[in-house]
Design a protein with these regions (language model features):
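Dinucleotide-binding Rossmann-like beta1-alpha1 core, especially the glycine-rich loop
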Residues: 51-135
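Glycine-rich FAD pyrophosphate-binding loop
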Residues: 28-47
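Helical element adjacent to the flavin cofactor pocket in flavoenzyme catalytic cores
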Residues: 150-186, 192-193, 197, 203
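Gly/Ala-rich phosphate-binding loop of Rossmann-like dinucleotide-binding domains
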Residues: 23, 27, 170
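Single conserved hydrophobic/aromatic residue that forms the stacking wall/gate
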Residues: 1-8, 12
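Central helical "cap/lid" subdomain
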Residues: 43, 192-221
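N-terminal Rossmann-fold NAD(P) dinucleotide-binding loop
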Residues: 19
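Glycine-rich Rossmann-fold phosphate-binding loop(s) that bind the pyrophosphate
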Residues: 14-16
Length: 221
């Protein structure tokens, strides 16, 4: 690929929904942004395979707060991401609470997580396994020590491809430039700030960064 030279204020990244989101937020702050994408069709990208869930039931406070921010952002997509060419952006949001169930071996860890939920005002409800049928009569409570869930306005899922498209179009509207190409070495890039959004391909570019691919399997029933 050609050498990408530009002013020192430029920011460079690589493809996918993280790249599009970063381009949006950086462009919104007035930064000059270029995104280098290996495959603009996203045929091998991770995000189109995602179920697109947004939730706040995590252990780490940072993840809980990120989940809360994601919810607020997603609910405002029609306003935040609209452009002249895309006046009605959507991510096909489906608000729906998440139910997480824990057996005796993992209940104690979840009780500790609930302390962070409370501190971060996650709005999580906690019940005993024996109470499950009161709320969810179709679930077998056998072997369940505790369960947590939220209401339908706190969590849910979106169409990740539509979300990416809305982010990308808004970033472009704000001045970001998306370039088809592949970065083989950081020496090819002349920029003040370089952000890698290569995901599971990170080690191909940054061998010293401890990011490795991990296979995930999803079953839809």
């Amino acid at each position: 690929p050609p050498h990408h030279s530009s002013a020192a204020s430029d920011v460079y990244k690589r493809q996918g929904i993280i790249g599009a989101a970063t381009a949006y937020f950086m462009s919104k702050e007035g930064r000059k942004v270029k995104v280098i994408e290996r495959d603009p069709t996203y045929k091998t990208a991770s995000f189109p395979l995602s179920l697109g869930g947004f939730r706040r039931q995590f252990f780490q406070k940072e993840n809980i707060l990120l989940g809360k921010f994601a919810r607020e952002f997603i609910f405002q997509i029609p306003e935040l991401l609209k452009t002249e060419k895309n006046p009605n952006p959507t991510a096909s949001m489906v608000p729906n609470g998440y139910l997480l169930m824990f057996g005796p071996d993992h209940a104690e860890e979840q009780y500790r997580a609930l302390e962070n939920h409370k501190e971060c005002e996650a709005g999580t409800k906690n019940i005993k396994g024996s109470e499950l049928k009161k709320y969810f009569p179709y679930i077998n409570e056998e072997g369940i020590e505790t369960a947590t869930f939220t209401d339908n306005k706190s969590e849910g899922w979106i169409d990740p491809f539509l979300f990416h498209s809305a982010l990308k179009h808004k970033a472009i509207d704000l001045g970001a430039e998306f370039i088809k190409g592949e970065v083989k070495s950081l020496s090819e890039i002349n920029a003040k700030t370089i952000i890698s959004a290569a995901g599971c391909w990170t080690k191909e570019l940054l061998e010293d960064i401890p990011v490795v691919p991990q296979k995930h399997t999803v079953f839809r029933v």
